[in-house]
UniProtKB/Swiss-Prot annotation:
PANTHER family: ADENOSYLHOMOCYSTEINASE. It comes from the Bacteria. This is Adenosylhomocysteinase. Keywords: Cytoplasm, Hydrolase, NAD, One-carbon metabolism. InterPro entries: Adenosylhomocyst_ase-like_sf, Adenosylhomocysteinase-like, Ado_hCys_hydrolase_NAD-bd, NAD(P)-bd_dom_sf, S-Ado-L-homoCys_hydrolase_CS. It catalyses: S-adenosyl-L-homocysteine + H2O = L-homocysteine + adenosine. One of its GO terms (cellular component) is cytosol. Substrate binds at T68, D151, E213, K243, D247. Binds 1 NAD(+) per subunit. CDD domains: SAHH. GO terms for molecular function: adenosylhomocysteinase activity. Its cofactor is NAD(+). It comes from Mycobacterium sp. (strain KMS).
Length: 489
């Protein structure tokens, strides 16, 4: 038995595998799930539409996505459409423990006799625990997983790199400059290779497709495709308009300030704020903080995004120009080493630093941890790091997603958009698999519009209907789609 297995074991009750913080939290979680269902009209509409069809029957979906109340509604939607599901979180801090417990127990079970879905997630996992949970999510009794639902690409990477190393006959040793997380990742694969030399290959051969939620994970998929390493089709859910223009912007606009407020309780009005990146997420960040009265500056590499920021009223600067005067610094780029150790040393005393991109490498956490700076934990996911000159910075969620680490993430309504796309994408790949090559695709425009229509109606909006003559004049169908693929919303 390996070191990891000695400390971490799968629990099982009433035939349900799980590893969560506390099953007794299930009643609290179920109450919040019921409220969330009311705010997630897209998912509830899909349940009604496909209730008699069960289009996902036979699908064994391994899901790696933040284990929140909203995700619980997604999981139970997949199950209601016929799928079997196993789940883990895609972030060590993002799990809401009452939601995880409620999913395991299920709507008709009890903590003593759960009747729900296997979940392996709890808030505050170590890196070793995180990757152990990811493996459990992908480890099915009997036949392997045949679908992946991913957020950030960790589940996909675990399967593909595991299969790649099995083919090579060896898991490579970690390099000195590899991140702590990558070392844990390699160690898990090495331990598993010692006991099962074909595990990941079998899973890779079984999987029919993957649907990916985030910008970071989509980038990984395109890299796998370009290298000829993608063994199954993938749908890029992130770039569905009803995901990227809503979750990324409006969700962030809500949850960023929630995380900052819960983590620090500082007044945002009047503060100097630096937002690194002005994509959809960065736009939501800037808008939310400016709305609180902050004085916002933006960094950008792309002149188009930079021009948008200027036209929206924000100065465009470099990190080096603004880091010394900023009271709050937020990274939202999807890239690495945006805030380096030198940048952190140059920040004001007690300045706040946080990330709302997917991974913790936007802020060079490895360099900070090696620097000799002392760390004092103020409260969960809030740390004060003091440098040798005596000044300190306040770091949120250890450089990981502060909106999920310090708060509860995006609200239910906006996640209904994103998760409706996930469900539709899973149905698409599962039921029409032979129509897709091993490449990365986007959902069709009419499906994007379908998701939007449901939510317009839920908010009480009334859509104008084209006449036949008007539709012919602009060369579209009366029922849509109304825009070409190249249209920029």
């Amino acid at each position: 038995m390996t070191t990891t297995e000695q400390r971490l074991t799968v629990e099982s009750r009433n035939g349900i595998d799980y590893k969560v913080a506390d099953l007794s939290l299930a009643e609290f979680g179920r109450k919040e799930i019921r409220l969330a269902e009311h705010e997630m009209p897209g998912l509830m509409a899909l349940r009604r539409e496909y209730a008699e069809v069960a289009p996902l029957k036979g699908a064994r979906i391994s899901g790696s996505l933040h284990m929140t109340v909203q995700t619980a509604v997604l999981i139970e939607t997949l199950v209601s459409l016929g799928a079997e599901v196993r789940w883990a979180s895609c972030n060590i801090f993002s799990t809401q423990d009452h939601a995880a417990a409620a999913v395991v127990v299920g709507p008709h079970g009890t903590p003593e006799e759960p009747k729900g879905t296997p979940v392996f997630a709890w808030k505050g996992e170590t890196l070793e625990e995180y990757w152990w949970a990811a493996e459990q999510m992908l480890t099915w009794p009997g036949e392997p997983a045949n679908m992946i639902l991913d957020d950030g690409g960790d589940a996909t990477m675990l399967v593909l790199r595991g299969a790649q190393f099995e083919k090579a006959g060896v898991v490579p040793p970690a390099e000195d400059d590899d991140s702590a997380e990558y070392k844990v990742f390699l160690n898990l694969l090495r331990e598993r290779f010692e006991t099962d030399k074909t595990k990941w290959t079998k899973i890779a051969e079984s999987v029919k497709g993957v649907t990916e939620e985030t910008t970071t994970g989509v980038l990984r998929l395109y890299q796998f495709e370009a290298a000829g390493e993608l063994p199954f089709p993938a749908i890029n859910v992130n770039d569905s308009v009803t995901k990227s223009k809503f979750d990324n912007k409006y969700g962030t606009r809500h949850s960023l300030i929630d995380g900052i407020n819960r983590g620090t309780d500082v007044l945002i009005g009047g503060k100097k704020v630096l937002i690194c990146g002005y994509g959809d997420v960065g736009k939501g960040c800037a808008e939310s903080l400016a709305g609180q009265g902050a004085r916002v500056q933006v960094t950008e590499i792309d002149p188009i995004n930079a021009l948008q920021a200027l036209m929206d009223g924000f100065d465009v600067v470099t990190v080096e120009q603004a880091i010394g005067s900023a009271d709050i610094v937020i990274t939202s780029t999807g890239n690495k080493d945006i805030i380096t150790l030198d940048h952190m040393k140059a920040m004001k005393d007690k300045a706040i630093l946080g990330n709302i991109g997917h991974f913790d490498n936007e802020i060079d956490m490895a360099a900070l941890e090696r620097s000799g700076a002392t760390r004092i934990n103020i409260k969960p996911q809030v740390d004060e790091w003091t440098f040798d000159d005596g000044h300190s910075i306040v770091l949120l969620s250890e450089g990981r997603l502060l909106n999920l680490g310090n708060a509860t993430g995006h609200p239910s309504f906006v996640m209904s958009n994103s998760f409706s796309n996930q469900v539709i994408a899973q149905i698409e790949l599962w039921t029409k698999n032979d129509e897709y090559d091993n490449a990365v695709y986007r959902l069709a425009k009419h499906l994007d519009e379908k998701v939007a229509r449901i939510h317009v109606e839920a908010l009480g909006g009334t859509l104008t209907k084209l006449t036949k003559e008007q539709a012919e004049y602009i060369n579209v169908d009366v029922e849509g789609p109304y825009k070409p693929e190249h249209y920029r919303y």
